[in-house]
Curated annotation (Swiss-Prot):
Gene3D superfamilies cross-referenced by the UniProt entry: P-loop containing nucleotide triphosphate hydrolases (3.40.50.300)
Annotated InterPro entries: AAA+_ATPase (IPR003593), Nuc-triphosphatase_THEP1 (IPR004948), P-loop_NTPase (IPR027417)
Entry's EC annotation: 3.6.1.15
CDD domains: RecA-like_Thep1 (cd19482)
SMART domains xrefs: AAA
NCBIfam families, sorted: PRK13695.1
Annotated disulfide bonds: none
Reaction(s) catalysed by this chain's protein: a ribonucleoside 5'-triphosphate + H2O = a ribonucleoside 5'-diphosphate + phosphate + H(+)
Keywords: ATP-binding, Hydrolase, Nucleotide-binding
UniProt binding sites for ATP: 10-17, 101-108
Name of the protein: Nucleoside-triphosphatase THEP1
Function: Has nucleotide phosphatase activity towards ATP, GTP, CTP, TTP and UTP. May hydrolyze nucleoside diphosphates with lower efficiency.
Family statement: Belongs to the THEP1 NTPase family.
Length: 184
């Protein structure tokens, strides 16, 4: 299996999570196994009140962050490390074992409050599994050298979606064919 990683970054609200979810859904429709996590905003009216993490394979939901009192903090958010790890770490572990594609949304400062997440991310980056990850803009330079990198904008998001989707499909088909040849 050939190593291939896709990293997507951009400003908040540009559509990084939407892109990751759309690609995951398309790859699943092709019959491949997709695992990992998606992070979504929690809103109270027009205001963001936190973030949840969702396991792509099971749909299990955990809380990543909320507005309130407590520690650890990032800005106005309290990071719920325990709830995040309860969903994210098993989801990433399953993706490493069983998935054809690993999706991690997001590699960012909230997630970095979890040492277990950092360990799991290290395992993913050392693995042979294809990876699609969204990266907080502060961490672009750290991850840019590790794979193909895209800066998402409202103007290019459809083109970036199409380009990454085509490349991942090609990669997964190559890996599938290589696996079939090895079994012959």
């Amino acid at each position: 299996m050939k190593k291939f990683r896709f990293f997507v970054s951009g400003m908040p609200g540009v559509g990084k999570t939407t892109l990751a979810k759309r690609i995951a859904d398309e790859i699943k429709r092709e019959g491949f196994k997709v695992g990992g996590i998606i992070t979504q905003e929690i809103r109270s009216g027009a205001r963001r009140s936190g973030f949840r993490v969702i396991a792509l394979d099971t749909g299990e939901i955990g809380r990543l962050a909320y507005v309130g009192q407590g520690y650890p903090r990032l800005g106005r958010y309290v990071i719920d490390v325990e709830s995040f790890e309860k969903v994210a770490i098993p989801a990433i572990s399953r993706a490493l074992r069983e998935g054809d594609l690993i999706v991690i949304d997001e590699i960012g400062p909230m997630e970095f409050k979890s040492n277990e997440f950092l360990k799991a991310l290290g395992l993913v980056l050392r693995s042979e599994k294809p990876l699609l990850a969204t990266v907080h803009r502060r961490f672009v330079e750290r991850y840019r050298p590790l794979g193909e990198y895209y800066w998402l904008t409202p103007e290019n998001r459809e083109a970036v979606f199409s380009e990454i989707l085509v490349k991942i499909k090609e990669l997964l088909r190559e890996n599938e064919n290589a696996g079939n040849k090895a079994q012959d």
